[in-house]
Amino acid sequence: MSGGRHSGAAVFLLPSSAMSEPKGPSSPGTDFIRQVVTADVASARHGGRVVTRFPPEPNGYLHVGHAMGICLNFGIAQEFGGRCHLRYDDTNPDTEKNEYVQSIQEDILWLGFDWGQHLYFASDYFERMYECAEVLVKKGLAYVDSQPNEAIREGRGTVTESGVASPFRDRSAEENLDLFGRRRAGEFEDGEHVLRGKIDMASPNMLMRDPVFYRIRHASHYRRGDDWCIYPLYDYAHCLEDAFEEVTHSICTLEFDNNRELYDWVLENVGFEEPRPHQYEWAGLDLENAVLSKRKIAPLVEAGVVSGWDPPRLATLTAYRRRGVPPEALRLLSELVGISKTGAQTEAAKLDYAIRQVLNQSAPRVMAVLDPIKVVITNYPSGKAEEFEAPYYPHDVPLEGSRTVPFSEEIWIERADFSEHPPKGFRRLVPGGEVRLRYAYVIRCDEVIKDDTGDILEVRCSYDSRTRGGSTSDGRKVGGTIQWVSVPHGVTAEVRLFDHLFLDEGPDGQDSGAIGDHINPDSLTIITSTKIEPSVLADQEDTRYQFERTGYFWRDPIDGPGDRLVFNRIVPLKDTWGKRGTSLPPTKVEIQTSLRVEAHSAPKREASQQTRIPPDEQAGERDAEAVARMERYTRELGVG
């Protein structure tokens, strides 16, 4: 899988405990679900066992919301010395594929979790589920309804009116068993009969008004082929799957709140005694500017708005992997968002913050110029080239490593770092002004060369040879520091800058047909003439970098390998919600992400002058709203 370990740059190593079944409990969290688990363990409710499960339906790719569920279920099992099952809820033959089975496993392993020997499929329980249904029929608690589906829906009533009993509700157990068996044998067409629970047509919970347990569907199942033509529905099957596997805590998102009553009814009446599984609901994750619904992503793929399920603008885990998001960042996001009973939309900036927190401590720094303009240093010896020793990490990152950066009389700088008519507060290169080239020299702008249309062709400067390494011996102050790339030595790359795919902060609330109307036309910018220092050519292709003063990048694992250089921006460098320099205390980060780092292994050369990266001198003050958000998050997390 891409984005894994490499010897060329510092990486976060997955904790060994995340890749095997835990041997004992660690320090549990304090959210309401963990409080329930703690109490159950203390009372030996399940003999002290803790068994959770992550039960995706293999009908699509996992998204960031699923990552929260994975972290919660596997995390609780790990904290309490239990186990977490991976179970595919594959009871729908129409939509499920082995392709999704494989991608889900890849996503879970990428996040740093492992189900070990506990991989299960609901389709393996079909016979046992059928036998449980027969138990309900024999007890007079389930019946075969021969009404059309529309009549069944209308007969359920409304939230203010009771339902109407089916004319087939009082069939004898013998007749129901006969019809149920003939349904399994394939005697009837799709939709001709259903099996319903016989509960309460006047229940205030409409899910308890004789819910459908089985339907007829003549379709080939991706695992079972044509063995079955009747299939159980979620509310009947899910609780049984938990009971068969002796799950202790069945954790669902809030939309299944009303299903809990039916969950308990099925298990109790089939004959599972206490202590049996119980369902607990949490709010889940709703990420702004993102569509998490598979049903709504599919039309975008079909219409060619995005090319498949892994384009980096999507919120699927396979898309995050391709973009270069480290899995530790999603684990940290899970901690930042937390577990609650009330839902709230999570700002996309919080995910960006989590990504920066991880990459700031691991990504080697290199120089790149996205929108280049040429600078000619007129008093630099013609044909000369020299090298500067540049560290990969700033002083506040506890990693070592450096590389050599070539310098020549012609260099590239960012077009935005030069201004003929600078605004107030501009601290970069201006006519007659000086600027510091990172690690190199101080230069002064002497002349601007333009073409006939007034576009700048090059900027001619002179350098102060006494300022090697960036320091001024006479103590004069230089406005700012900018990155650069040597013209004859730099490599050309394509860079892809991603923004939110949707303009609306809540696109998941839109109808599927209207989703396309909310696409951000500027969500993808492709720059084909980016210049990067040549040191990147010696690194492994899955190295994540900080392009200084720009953002975090890595090579696209599909379009970028080999001779072609294609870099994806993982996240911009600017923090839109946290105060500069503010971070979670090291102990908090260590607890939340279980990370350790390995130093960059590039050879370190001796040099007469070693330069540390100073703070970004171009960063401005963050806006008051961002500061307020950061302070709120700090309070929520309980950190100083």
Model-derived features: where do they sit?
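Short, Lys/Arg-enriched N-terminal segments with co-localized hydrophobic residues
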Residues: 3-18
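Secondary-structure transition/capping motifs at alpha-helix termini
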Residues: 43-46, 75-83, 107-116, 139, ...
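Conserved short loop/turn motifs at secondary-structure junctions
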Residues: 55-58, 87-95, 117-127, 150, ...
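A glycine-rich helix N-cap at a beta->alpha junction
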Residues: 100-126, 132-135, 140-143
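Long, charged, mostly alpha-helical binding arms that flank functional sites
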Residues: 275-354, 358
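Substrate/cofactor-recognition hotspot
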Residues: 333-634
